Amino acid sequence: MMGAMQVVLEALHQGDYDTAFETLVRTLALAQGQDAAEAALLLAEAYSLYGEGGIEGANRALEEGLVSVPTLESHPRYRSILGEMRALEGAPEEDVRQILTKTSDPHALYHQAQALMYLGLPEEALEVLNQPLELPAFLAWRAHTLQGKAYERMGQAAEAAAAYKEASRLAVGLEHYWNLIDASAMFVEAGLGHEALQALREAQPDIPELEDPEDAATRYYLEARSQLLLGNPGLALDAIQRALEKEREGAEPAHGTPLVHGQALMQLGHPREAIEAFREAVGRAEDSDKSYALHELAVAYLESGELAEAESTLREVMRDPEYGYQGEAYGDLAEILYRLGRYEEASQAAHEAIRLGSLSAGHLILGNLACDLLHLEEALEHYALASEEAPEGSRDWVTAQQMAVDTLAQLGFRRPDEIISRSEAVLPYLHPADEWHQTLNNYAERARNMIGGNRTLN
């Protein structure tokens, strides 16, 4: 019996399910008493790996175990697998909790965590999974994968990525590969481009010789998003074009592919080309994804100088009450209205952006409005706030730094040290051919002369 069970455990770990099921069915037919009960429990566990597709088989195995050992009904693993199956069938939470029992059995705890996940209780599942569980190899990696799913459902992308990465370390073959792909996806969501690319590189040796176009498209999509995070739009464009090619070869068209295509083109400074990509993304997307794609399209119109189209597209976004970036949308609308010369509306939109948390965009427009009225003190205050709130290197941050220096210069080169420090901070983000590059250099040089120093720019 022990030899047969070892064969089953190894087969399950290696993904050789035919051998595992054949051995279990044969063992269950020949065994009696506790041996039959143990075989039935392991058979039920094996069926449980198939999710909904394994419900009937798992229930049948549990029933066969009861025939051999009627007292099996009180066994923690029996009750945990039964609870998992009931949760998977959609039973009420209260009914499932009555089945589950307090236990320290690692197998039982794993299946309880699965049941809790099926009930939509990832926090409770994590309380179970974060305990040290000594599980056989075929369940050990799955416990970490389940941990990753729980963190993912809770919106904790970095923690999910770490769990999937650990699962990949313990898994073999395609399961090793898929956990690395999941880890890469979560690293991307966490904004960790380097770690995402590293996970993709680790998955490379496990890519099937005849890779499904769908899987290849996913891989190239993640590579493109990783490169965008790392500020490599050219490499991102290469990768996303490969993903689009895989869609033409049969992969399911996803809204994210043209969306990332457009984002790469935007970073490369080609907003007009990006418009077509974002239009395609809008056509493919639904619900909040569609609103996000519309927002990207509006920004592309804005950058292309097509202000009327930008405004109408953005107002469509703002009609979605569930959209999670309303503050940013109001900030972009404020810029559009400012550039259209509708200053009162621009001011209202900017204040609404600030109220909704998009501080840098709102203060930037309010600074521009104050500057136009020659209210330079007020303008400087807004630009300073915008530069503090915007992420360093972002479009808003660069613009706020430029305008703060320019305003200080208009105020008679007040605070020359600040002119120098702001100029030194922003110059690395500007192309030498950018007219602001020379302007800031000139301002900084004059400020240094005023304080009699010999500081040089980086």
Positions of the model-derived regions?
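Start-of-helix register in tetratricopeptide repeats
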Residues: 2, 38-40, 74-77, 107, ...
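"A position-specific structural signal for the A-helix of alpha-solenoid helical repeats
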Residues: 6, 42-44, 77-81, 111, ...
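Residue-level recognition of tetratricopeptide repeat
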Residues: 9, 45-47, 84, 114, ...
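Residue-level detector of the short coil/turn that links helix A to helix B
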Residues: 15, 51-53, 90, 120, ...
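Single-residue signature of alpha-solenoid repeat helices
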Residues: 20, 58, 92-96, 125, ...
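Flexible helix-coil transition and linker loops at the boundaries of alpha-helical arrays
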Residues: 28-37, 67-77, 98-103, 133-138, ...
